[in-house]
Design a protein with these regions (language model features):
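Stable alpha-helical elements in mature extracytoplasmic
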Residues: 38-39, 45-48, 87, 156, ...
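Cleavable N-terminal signal peptides
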Residues: 8-11, 20
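N-terminal signal peptide c-region/cleavage motif recognized by signal peptidases
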Residues: 15-17
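Hydrophobic ligand-binding cavity/cleft-lining segments
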Residues: 20-68
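Glycine-rich portal/gate segments that line the openings of hydrophobic small-molecule binding cavities
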Residues: 54, 63-111, 122, 166, ...
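Bacterial N-terminal signal peptides that target proteins for export
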Residues: 1-9
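Amphipathic hydrophobic-ligand
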Residues: 25, 111-118
Length: 178
């Protein structure tokens, strides 16, 4: 009986520490911008999963490589303007009724791991909209307390905060200048 009790105690302790480790490195960002256009007009631009290059200044090109329209499971290939690196992302959920999409990183050069992003367009009245863009991820070297240069929390946060802020500003400009 003592052997079983020891086994259960070890299993509980091991599980608890694994769960604590899994949550320890999560980083979150949230950005929002108000746009002088109805939500449906904003969604027509922002909700085109394969067309992010039309409004994101950091994206040189983007194309769907799996599925030819906005649907769950679609894969897009992005080419970054700054350094020409490629990133592949997958559309996890696409809800045009609520003007919401969720996507994740699949492959390529990225400065975070376990990346998941959600973009939502909301009507706020008087022909205006609010776009909310949130991301959840971990720094690249999440398993160590001493990550190499460029793989720490600050590097991941700086890169993705910059991408979201410039992306939202680009979306506002693209929609309002139509």
């Amino acid at each position: 009986m003592k052997t079983i009790a020891k086994f259960v105690a070890v299993a509980v302790l091991a599980t608890g520490s694994v769960l604590a480790f899994a949550d320890a490195g999560d980083l979150n960002i949230f950005h929002t911008i108000d746009i002088d256009a109805p939500a449906d007009e904003v969604w027509a631009v922002a909700g085109n999963f394969g067309g992010i290059q039309r409004w994101s200044p950091g994206t040189e090109s983007s194309r769907l490589v799996l599925h030819d329209r906005n649907e769950t499971g679609a894969i897009r290939l992005l080419l970054r303007r700054s350094d020409g690196t490629q990133v592949t992302e997958k559309l996890l959920d696409y809800d045009p009724y609520n003007r919401r999409m969720v996507y994740t990183y699949v492959d390529g050069v990225v400065r975070a791991s376990d990346y998941r992003s959600e973009l939502v367009v909301k009507e706020i009245g008087e022909g205006k909209s609010r776009v909310e863009w949130r991301g959840q991820f971990r720094r690249l070297a999440y398993w160590t307390d001493n990550p190499p240069p460029g793989q720490d929390d600050k590097a991941a946060l700086d890169f993705l905060n910059g991408a979201y802020v410039s992306g939202l500003a680009g979306l506002k400009k693209a929609v309002e200048e139509r």
